[in-house]
């Protein structure tokens, strides 16, 4: 009788090879009945001896028990966004900037790779010794949500790399998506069950990836194309085309509709071809990604703050459609701003039915010379947000009347005002239900107090039933009352009360941001909180020395004036008093004050005016932790090595940046050198 361990290993190999041939190569090599028999044999072996289970076993694709939630994880390599180009001129301008940063003549030819931009959801896959260890969403580019159990169900993602002697770690980036035919089948099933239909494949994919039950994910049959590869040190292929070939050989599905082009003209032909040919593809694509092929040239070009200079996404022109304007409504934002909304006869755009679009403000209405009954042209900006592009006045009915914005708030009936040169018309009634709902949503949002379990629907119930009239009222709710509301149970209510209680310990800058003061975003809130350790000191400065606020980096007189106006409005003063009564200090903790003081002391520190580059994997510090230490000491972190670089901080698998730094005579530091340099 065969050894169970050897037989299980043999079955894993046979089934994984067959799965790769079927899902990735589209060339089945095993009969379905044979596959099913071998699969059942492996499953039985693993059930009899759980010690035989391995992460790369095909039995692990079906998903385990539902998860309670997702954890946030840091990406080993950041996932930056791409700059966009919307036409040939934009693409040419990007190419000219690239030549300039590479110090090449304007007529130079650069090797470029053209790839289809798949309209799905980006994933980060981490492999350790050839086995899938972790999968995460893109998130904010630095951190994402771990969804490994869900990603294991995607058959075109190998659980084990199909290569001999894989590197110790491999990082892969790619796009999860739902093919058009699969999407149609999913919506047909949902329609039969009388469930809400998904708007488009991208939305369906995003919702599927965040399902807590992997079995639901498996049933929706997601697909995946790999497009980015990160390997340690010298193992990294020399260019993008070679990286795609490596991914293909390792068992990943790589989009076959790609091309290695010798110059910009060839890339433009590639883009033109797929702008027309995309409609014949079995999946959605919303553009072409153009990348510089050569890795050394990529390193030389470097990055801006948010995107690589060596790549660009050429977006296809937005679809447009004519329709008839029926009416113009109005929405009230959390600051009281009135946003006019065009309502028109529904038209299909980019895979969805569209019947509403923002008109932004009164100036936009005047610019369009909009009349009720007009024939308007609508498009989706970036194929996401509907907008009115223009009016066709030659089709205007003789009895059409100009669109007028309301004079009273549609929510509370108060008179609307328009201050100075502002484009926005506003409701200034602090008791307006719409302003209250928006303020509550902002207060509990992730960047502010980050209260889990308090969504828009629940906020609407609380406001509409008169249970909450201010931010402070949230903290007077008890579990019994919450449990009586729609879609709330005892456990959900108890968890929400605990989450609200915990939010009182959020840092001072989050509390300040959560107040929703006009022009005070997250960055400005941090700057203000670091300079003024309490709401009282901030209010005093706003009254007696507003120039102190205006002089802060990134603030200025307009923001200072807005802050002063808010702080000295009686209704807001009452709100601050109420927040204190429910347990908010509205001031920085001792540790926050010490950290801010230290940061201020280090503003002229050892790295003031210095430019550093990070490369490789540091033994103890994450990339973001090292960056924070450098910036706290007054230094600047750049994405590329140049003659202006003062220090290169190099970890394991430093790669080409280390080579370039050494050739330029840049001082190279280890993590230990960096921490020693920062010691007082």
Curated annotation (Swiss-Prot):
N-terminal signal peptide: none
- The UniProt record lists the keyword Metal-binding: yes
State the UniProt keywords alphabetically. DNA damage, DNA repair, DNA replication, Ligase, Magnesium, Manganese, Metal-binding, NAD, Zinc
**Stretches for region Disordered:** 47-66
Pfam families linked to this entry: BRCT (PF00533), DNA_ligase_aden (PF01653), DNA_ligase_OB (PF03120), DNA_ligase_ZBD (PF03119), HHH_2 (PF12826), HHH_5 (PF14520)
Q: What are the record's GO terms for cellular component?
A: cytosol
Q: Which NCBIfam families match?
A: dnlj, PRK07956.1
Q: What is this protein called?
A: DNA ligase
The coenzyme or cofactor needed here is: Mg(2+); Mn(2+)
Q: What does this protein do?
A: DNA ligase that catalyzes the formation of phosphodiester linkages between 5'-phosphoryl and 3'-hydroxyl groups in double-stranded DNA using NAD as a coenzyme and as the energy source for the reaction. It is essential for DNA replication and repair of damaged DNA.
Q: What is its EC number?
A: 6.5.1.2
Q: Which CDD domains match?
A: BRCT_DNA_ligase_like, LIGANc
Q: One MF term from GO for this chain?
A: DNA ligase (NAD+) activity
Q: Which residues bind NAD(+)?
A: 32-36, 81-82, 115, 138, 175, 291, 315
Classification via InterPro entries: BRCT_dom, BRCT_dom_sf, DisA/LigA_HHH, DNA_ligase, DNAligase_adenylation, DNAligase_N, NA-bd_OB-fold, NAD_DNA_ligase_OB
Q: Where does Zn(2+) bind?
A: 409, 412, 427, 432
This enzyme catalyses:
NAD(+) + (deoxyribonucleotide)n-3'-hydroxyl + 5'-phospho-(deoxyribonucleotide)m = (deoxyribonucleotide)n+m + AMP + beta-nicotinamide D-nucleotide
Keyword DNA damage present in the record's keywords: the answer is yes
Q: What biological-process GO terms show up in the record?
A: DNA repair; DNA replication
Q: What class of enzyme is it?
A: ligase
Q: Which Gene3D superfamilies match?
A: 5' to 3' exonuclease, C-terminal subdomain (1.10.150.20), 6.20.10.30, BRCT domain (3.40.50.10190), DNA ligase/mRNA capping enzyme (3.30.470.30), Helix hairpin bin (1.10.287.610), Nucleic acid-binding proteins (2.40.50.140)
Enumerate the active-site residues.
117
Taxonomic classification: Bacteria, Bacillati, Cyanobacteriota, Cyanophyceae, Synechococcales
Domain BRCT: start-end pairs: 602-680
């Amino acid at each position: 009788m065969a050894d169970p361990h050897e037989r299980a290993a043999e079955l894993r190999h046979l089934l994984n090879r067959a799965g790769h041939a079927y899902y990735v190569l589209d060339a089945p090599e095993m009969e379905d009945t044979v596959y099913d028999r071998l699969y059942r044999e492996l499953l039985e072996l693993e059930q009899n001896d759980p010690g035989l289970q391995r992460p790369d076993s095909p039995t692990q694709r079906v998903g385990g028990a539902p998860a309670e939630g997702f954890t946030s994880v840091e990406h080993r390599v950041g996932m930056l966004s791409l700059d966009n180009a919307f036409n040939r001129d934009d693409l040419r301008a990007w190419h000219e900037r690239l030549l300039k940063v590479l110090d090449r003549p304007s007529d130079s030819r650069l090797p470029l790779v053209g790839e289809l931009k798949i309209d799905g959801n980006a994933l980060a896959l981490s492999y350790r010794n050839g086995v899938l260890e972790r999968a995460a969403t893109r998130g904010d580019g630095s951190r994402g949500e771990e969804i490994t159990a869900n990603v294991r169900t995607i058959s075109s993602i190998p659980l084990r790399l199909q290569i001999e002697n894989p590197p110790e770690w491999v990082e892969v980036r790619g796009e999860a998506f739902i093919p058009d035919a699969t999407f149609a089948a999913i919506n047909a099933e949902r329609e039969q069950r009388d469930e809400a239909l998904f708007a488009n494949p991208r939305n369906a994919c995003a919702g599927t990836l965040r399902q807590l039950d992997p079995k639901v994910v498996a049933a929706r049959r997601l697909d995946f194309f790999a497009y980015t590869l990160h390997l340690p040190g010298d193992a990294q292929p020399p260019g993008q085309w070679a990286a795609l070939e490596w991914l293909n050989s390792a068992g990943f599905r790589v989009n076959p509709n790609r091309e290695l082009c010798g110059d910009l003209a060839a890339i433009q032909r590639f883009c033109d071809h797929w702008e027309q040919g995309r409609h014949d593809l079995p999946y959605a694509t919303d553009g072409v990604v153009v990348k510089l092929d050569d890795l050394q040239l990529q390193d030389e070009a470097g990055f801006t703050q948010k995107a690589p200079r060596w790549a660009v996404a050429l977006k296809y022109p937005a679809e447009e459609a004519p329709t008839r304007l029926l009416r113009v409504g109005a929405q009230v934002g959390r600051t009281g701003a009135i946003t006019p909304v065009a309502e028109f006869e529904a038209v299909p755009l980019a895979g969805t039915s569209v019947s509403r679009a923002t008109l932004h403000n009164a100036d936009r209405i005047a610019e369009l010379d909009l009349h009720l009954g007009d024939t308007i042209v609508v498009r989706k900006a970036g194929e996401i947000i509907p907008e009115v592009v223009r009016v066709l006045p030659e089709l205007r009915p003789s009895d059409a009347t100009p669109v007028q914005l309301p004079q009273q708030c549609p929510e509370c009936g108060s008179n609307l005002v328009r201050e100075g040169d502002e484009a926005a018309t506003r409701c200034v009634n602090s008791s307006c239900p719409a302003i209250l709902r928006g303020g509550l949503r902002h207060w509990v949002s992730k960047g502010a107090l980050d209260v889990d379990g308090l969504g828009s629907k629940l906020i609407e119930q609380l406001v509409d039933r008169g249970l909450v009239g201010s931010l402070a009222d949230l903290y007077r709710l008890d579990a019994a009352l919450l449990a009586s509301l729609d879609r709330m149970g005892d456990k959900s209510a108890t968890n929400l009360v605990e989450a609200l209680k915990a939010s009182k310990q959020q840092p001072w800058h989050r509390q300040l941001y959560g107040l929703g003061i006009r022009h005070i975003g997250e960055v400005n809130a941090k700057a203000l909180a670091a300079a003024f350790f309490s709401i009282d000191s901030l209010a005093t400065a706003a009254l007696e020395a507003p120039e102190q606020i205006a002089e802060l980096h990134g603030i200025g007189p307009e923001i200072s004036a807005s802050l002063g106006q808010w702080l000295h409005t009686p209704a807001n003063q009452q709100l601050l008093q109420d927040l204190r009564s429910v347990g908010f200090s509205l001031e920085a903790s001792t540790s926050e004050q010490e950290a801010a003081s230290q940061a201020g002391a280090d503003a002229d520190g050892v790295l003031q005016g210095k430019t550093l580059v990070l490369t490789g994997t540091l033994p103890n510090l994450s990339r973001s932790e090292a960056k924070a230490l450098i910036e706290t000491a007054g230094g600047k972190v750049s994405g590329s090595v140049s003659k202006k670089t003062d220090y290169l901080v190099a970890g394991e698998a430093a790669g080409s940046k280390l080579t370039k730094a050494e050739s330029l005579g840049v001082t190279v530091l280890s993590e230990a050198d960096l921490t020693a340099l920062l010691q007082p």
